């Protein structure tokens, strides 16, 4: 292992300690809490704190004159750049872990997240975006930094369980950002949130100090323990180039990029697309769509205990994952049909929840969430299940999976955004009495991109081909739990 001054400092007085479950869970909890803070900070920006230029929110703050606000394409380009930055940060995680150790990579990523504290007080919009990009790079790294902890401290059964709970923190954070803008707390409270957007971002940013201080005090240098270094020296030498040359890396990119589209695009695009599909330019059903998204995210809390249970058993994974993702996308299509043909046609019930069609719409969102969120734990556990898997390899692999997955996600975002709002097209001049063709085209793309994951799964190898196929099981007694 090549040394540098940071690694030299990190390796001083390293005393090997037992890799106990309690320590592992503590480190895991600190990192997933940091990830939830990132999701909250990031989500509030698009959930409602953005406001409108010349009126409220951070757009009203930076552009008090609405005529000076950046156009749609510029705003989209900014978002694309930030997402690409997150992808680059994800790819760099594996390299940083090798160069400065896991503990100091975590601390560095949390330091990046502290830029979220000062971003709201930037004197310019450009500064605000740059500071939030640095913050986002640090926040994105958290989901990858979980994996070496899980790989080192937990056995195979414990990994299967914890992989079910790790995904909880994205929907929890996102639900928190949606609640103030779902009509639950009233219009005055919504206005207060938007008017005090800097304080909201400041409070969330300050929460980052909890995992930062916690990890400085409690974080361990498990990857620098002599026994781990000895194991790593006996293993194949890995680099980013090694993984770039492997076909599996690109199959994982297809799978994770497509899955990200399936779970993030409904949150990003449902409101504008749903409104345009029914010709509603006033956002009359905005609150109801927010509640639909809350139901979708709430599916995360049921998914791991239903859909996600497969990780605990000796059953093949690939076809199961593909089927569940397809089913989740199917529920999204059904929910859209119900909204466009029934819920969105009934303006009398736009603000109430007493009609049956609304509840069907909401529960389809829940079923969609159970499938798409519930399957995440099964997917996250897959790299741990392949023969030859080790913490060193998993750290590199997850960095690339998320980094390249975010890149694929960004490409899908650019294409969908350009179809949804083509440059030079004035949406205000579209005929709202008819279905908006641009919005419909964007929606069809979302469905296609969400289903591409099946291609990645078909190309990947089954991690345990000796496991039984679920469809060939004839009784529960044939299903065996994974041994430690």
Swiss-Prot record:
NCBIfam families xrefs: MMSYN1_0881 (NF043062)
Question: Topologically, how does it sit relative to the membrane?
Answer: Multi-pass membrane protein
Chief place where the protein resides: membrane
- The name of this protein is Uncharacterized protein mhp246
From which organism does this entry originate?
Mesomycoplasma hyopneumoniae (strain 232) (Mycoplasma hyopneumoniae)
Where are the membrane-spanning stretches? Answer: 19-39, 78-98, 111-131, 134-154, 165-185, 199-219, 249-269, 289-309, 321-341, 360-380, 398-418, 440-460
Q: Provide the protein's localization.
A: Cell membrane
One MF term in the entry's GO annotations? carboxylic acid transmembrane transporter activity
User: What does the UniProt keyword field contain?
Assistant: Cell membrane, Membrane, Transmembrane, Transmembrane helix
What Gene Ontology cellular-component terms does the record carry?
plasma membrane
Q: Does the keyword Nucleus apply?
A: no
Q: Which domain of life is it from?
A: Bacteria
